[in-house]
């Protein structure tokens, strides 16, 4: 296909293996690649923006394959995408990719994900965008995920990519030859046993570390093909999950399902 202008970001930071592998795969496929990503770990920052301090961006070409332009930005993933689209890039890209995240972005976890937020910022600006995640924090072999991400993006662009559609790709932690077949999936609803670990600093003040373990995964009750598996079930079957997401979160269950508000005004 015609070479694409691809903008890549992430939330794991400029030194993460995932983003470097994805950028290298995109460049190897003949595309023009620009990276604008956080200068440090920014996981679980959601769609947060930096408003009270300045944002700095420094060139980081030396961390990537020759020919890839890169900036390391002091802000959040959403900051990086805004700065790239409205200041750093001379023209809008054809495609936005975010990742490869070092860990899954499944179900309702997408609301916390900086990886998904960076892609969503592209979607909000009317650009085709995809978030890519390796569904295991310990897995460090990103080549299969990068190859699949480029294949999916190229195929979608060659056919149709509806406006306001974000694609969320999660890839299981296994070799490509052991991987199941890619499938469209639905978002699951994830529930956590939130665990706060209290500590005391040298001045006697209490602080907390947040940890949590997913204890339940529910099928969403929203609209969509009911024969699609959930993204969590797909990954548990060692198969890649591709979930279409849209930024418009309006309730679609109908007026009869909403509470009756007998309020005097």
From Swiss-Prot:
EC numbers, comma separated: 3.1.3.5
Signal sequence residues: none
Recorded superkingdom: Bacteria
Any GO molecular function: metal ion binding
Coarse class of the protein's main subcellular location: cytoplasm
Keyword annotations from UniProtKB, A to Z: Cytoplasm, Hydrolase, Metal-binding, Nucleotide-binding
Catalytic activity field: a ribonucleoside 5'-phosphate + H2O = a ribonucleoside + phosphate
Sections of the chain in a coiled coil: none
Metal-binding keyword on record: yes
Location relative to the cell: Cytoplasm
Binding site for a divalent metal cation: 11-12, 43, 101
InterPro entries assigned to the protein according to its UniProt record, in alphabetical order: SurE, SurE-like_Pase/nucleotidase, SurE-like_sf
Free-text comment on the cofactor: Binds 1 divalent metal cation per subunit.
Nucleotide-binding listed as a keyword: yes
Cellular compartments per GO CC: cytoplasm
SUPFAM superfamilies: SurE-like
Cofactor: a divalent metal cation
Free-text function comment from the UniProt entry: Nucleotidase that shows phosphatase activity on nucleoside 5'-monophosphates.
Sequence similarity: Belongs to the SurE nucleotidase family.
Protein name: 5'-nucleotidase SurE
Gene this chain is encoded by: surE
């Amino acid at each position: 296909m015609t070479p694409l202008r691809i903008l890549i970001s992430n939330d794991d930071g400029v030194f993460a293996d995932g983003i470097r592998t994805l950028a290298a795969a995109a460049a190897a496929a003949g595309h023009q690649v620009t990276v604008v990503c956080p200068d440090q770990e920014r996981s679980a920052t959601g769609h947060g923006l930096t408003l009270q301090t300045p944002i700095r961006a420094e060139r980081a070409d030396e961390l990537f394959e020759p020919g890839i332009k890169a900036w390391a930005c002091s802000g959040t993933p959403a900051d990086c995408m805004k700065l790239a689209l409205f200041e750093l890039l001379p023209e809008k890209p054809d495609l936005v990719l975010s990742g490869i995240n070092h860990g899954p972005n499944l179900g309702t976890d997408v609301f916390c994900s900086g990886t998904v937020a960076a892609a969503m910022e592209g979607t909000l600006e009317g650009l085709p965008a995809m978030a890519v995640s390796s569904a295991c924090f310990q897995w460090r072999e990103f080549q299969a995920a990068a190859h699949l991400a480029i294949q999916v993006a190229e195929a979608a662009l060659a056919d149709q990519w509806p406006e306001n559609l974000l694609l969320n790709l999660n890839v299981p932690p296994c070799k490509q030859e052991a991987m199941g077949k890619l499938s469209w999936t639905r978002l699951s609803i994830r529930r956590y046993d939130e665990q706060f670990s209290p500590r005391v600093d040298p001045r006697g003040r209490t602080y907390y570390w947040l940890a949590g373990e997913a204890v339940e995964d529910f099928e969403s009750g929203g609209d969509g093909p009911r024969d699609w598996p959930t993204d969590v079930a797909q990954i548990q079957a060692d198969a890649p999950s591709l979930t279409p997401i849209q930024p418009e979160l309006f309730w679609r269950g109908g007026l009869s399902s909403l509470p009756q508000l007998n309020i005097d005004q």
